[in-house]
Amino acid sequence: QEGGRLLESWESENRYATRYISRVTDRLNLEASNALFAELVEEMHRRGMRVILDGVFNHCGSFNKWMDRERIYERQPGYEPGAFISADSPYRSFFKFHNEHEWPYNPFYDGWWGHDTLPKLNYEDSPKLEEYILRIAAKWVSPPYNVDGWRLDVAADLGFSQEYNHEFWRKFRKAVKEANPDAIILAEHYGDASGWLRGDQWDTVMNYDAFMEPLTWFFTGMEKHSDNYQPGMLGNARCFVDAMRYHMASFLAPSLQTAMNELSNHDHSRFLTRTNHLVGRVNHLGSEAASGNIHPEVMREAVVMQMTWPGAPTLYYGDEAGVCGFTDPDNRRTYPWGHEDQQ
C-alpha cells in the first residue's frame, strides 16, 4: 500500500515499526509482489551478496492447490478442484493415487516417506508437471529476478526410479544453465553423490559426508542429531582423517571446492549444543538443556577448520551469535536480536 519500498538500514529500530504494521496486516500486502522480489535481489547484488532459492520439487504440501486436502480452495472463486477433491482435477496426474473409487476426497496417494501432508509429485506420469517445473527452474534465474542458483531439497528422492531421477536433473541443469550459466545447482544429499556430480546434473552438494559428520564426531563425539554419543570418536584423529579421505575421494575437484560446509543447519541439532554431549531431543529434554554445559571454545576450533577447509563455509543463522538448540524444530529458534553472545 505504501509502494512496497524496502526498509532502509536506519529504519531498523523499533520506533519505526508502527509505520509498517499495516503493510503486514492489510490483506493486499500479505503476499509480496514479484516486482518487490526482483528489487530485493537487485539490492542484494548491489551489496555484493548472492541469492539461492530453495527448490522443493520432490513433493508439495497437502494444502497446495494442486492437492487441496485441507479443502482451502474448494469453494474459492477462480480455483480448479484439487486432486484430493475430484477425479476430474487438472492436477490428478501430478500425484499417484492407489484407489480409484475413493473420490471425492481421495486420501489414498503417495506421500514422501509416508507423510500424507507431503504428497509426492508424480513426474513420470505427468509431462505437464515436468514442463511446469522446468519452466520454474529457468524463470527465477532469468531477468528480471536474476537469482544465483537453486538448493534442491531431497534431490535424490525425486521421481519413482533412479533412471528418471537422473533424466530429470539433466533436463533441469539444461534449463537453468541456458538461462543463467553462472547459476549454481546445489543438492541436499546424504551418501555418495558421484553419480550426480559428473557435470551433467548437480554442481555440488550440502556436504554431510565429507564435512559435517566427520567434524561433529571429531570435535564432539556426537551424532549430528544429538541422538548418540560415542566417547571413542571424540578427538579420534585416525577416524577423522580416514573418513575425510574416503568421502572426499568421491568428489571431483570443482564439486569439492564449492561444497556447502556446515556445522549446523535446519535439520540437525546446533553444533554448540552438541558440545555438551547430551543425547536426546527437545520433547524429552526441554529447550533449556540445549544450552547447558556447552563448550564455546570447541565450536571456535571447529569454525577455524570450517573457514579453512576446501569448500564453501556456510553459516546457519544464529551460530555466530551463540544460538543453541536440539534437532528440528528446536534448532530454528528466533535470532537473539540485541542479546547476541559476542564471544
What are these regions (language model features)?
Residues 1-35, 114-130, 153-164, 225-238, ...:
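The substrate-binding groove and active-site-proximal loops of carbohydrate-active enzymes
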Residues 35-39, 61, 127, 131-134, ...:
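A structural signal for well-ordered alpha-helical segments within the folded catalytic domains
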Residues 63, 68, 169, 173-174, ...:
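Conserved alpha/beta catalytic core and glycan-binding cleft of carbohydrate-active enzymes
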Residues 118, 136-143, 147-176, 192-213:
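Conserved N-terminal glycine/acidic-rich loop preference
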Residues 246, 337-343:
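Aromatic- and carboxylate-lined catalytic core of secreted/periplasmic carbohydrate-active enzymes
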